[in-house]
Regions:
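N-terminal Rossmann-fold NAD(P) dinucleotide-binding loop
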Residues: 102-103
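Phosphate-binding beta-alpha-beta segment of Rossmann-like dinucleotide-binding domains, i.e.
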Residues: 39, 44-92, 107
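Short, well-ordered alpha-helix to beta-strand connector turns
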Residues: 1, 13-16, 113, 128-129, ...
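An N-terminal-biased, well-structured beta-alpha scaffold segment characteristic
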Residues: 1-40, 167
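Surface-exposed amphipathic alpha-helices with a cationic face
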Residues: 106-110, 170
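Glycine-rich Rossmann-fold phosphate-binding loop(s) that bind the pyrophosphate
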Residues: 98-99
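Conserved beta-strand positions in the Rossmann-like core of class I SAM-dependent methyltransferases
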Residues: 117
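Rossmann-like adenosine-cofactor binding region
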Residues: 122-171
């Protein structure tokens, strides 16, 4: 179930007792209703950790290696060199959310020689060179070269990546 309750209210299912989501976030489920009616909701935490982490690496590599530029040049039969491409080694990657997706990202970026900084509610999480508490997110983000948000969408996380926080990033 993912999005069913956007179109059909849960009271249309009078025998509903359990919901299994295909996502980690609960943003598409009326949790107040579920809690009030004793309906158990299970998410798919961890199921997409590897593909999400690989997508994050792909996106960062695409940015640093200017993949869109070279793809466009290739389609125009232009074989340009670009000597200003940066490498990931030595970059400081800030991963906001040290759950299964965040830890999978940390593992993959570490393979490129990156320093891995985490931001999480828990301040003791394996796989990170340093962990900041969620209250110190601005300090963590301002120290990073790359910032990746690995949080399920919930009431608590919905507006965490706002303009003020993103403006705190390094140039």
């Amino acid at each position: 179930c993912n999005g069913l309750f956007l179109y059909t209210p849960p009271d249309k299912f009078p025998k509903l007792r359990t919901v299994q989501l295909t996502s980690a976030g609960l943003d598409r489920v009326p949790m107040d209703y579920m809690d009030a009616h004793g309906i158990k909701v299970f998410n798919a935490r961890g199921v997409y950790s590897a593909p999400m982490a690989e997508f994050a690496v792909c996106s960062v590599l695409g940015f640093y290696k200017r993949s869109a530029f070279f793809s466009a040049a290739q389609s125009e039969h232009r074989w340009e060199k670009h000597r200003g491409l940066e490498e990931l080694g030595g970059k400081r990657v800030v991963i906001v959310g040290a759950g299964s997706v965040g830890r999978a990202c940390a593992d993959r970026f570490r393979a490129f020689g990156c320093e891995i900084i985490g931001v999480d509610r828990r301040t003791a999480v394996d796989g990170f060179d340093k962990i900041y508490s969620i209250g110190d997110i601005r300090a963590a983000v301002s120290a990073g070269d790359i910032v990746i948000f690995c949080l399920p969408l919930t009431k608590e996380t919905e507006h965490i990546a706002n303009a003020e926080l993103l403006c705190a990033m390094k140039d």
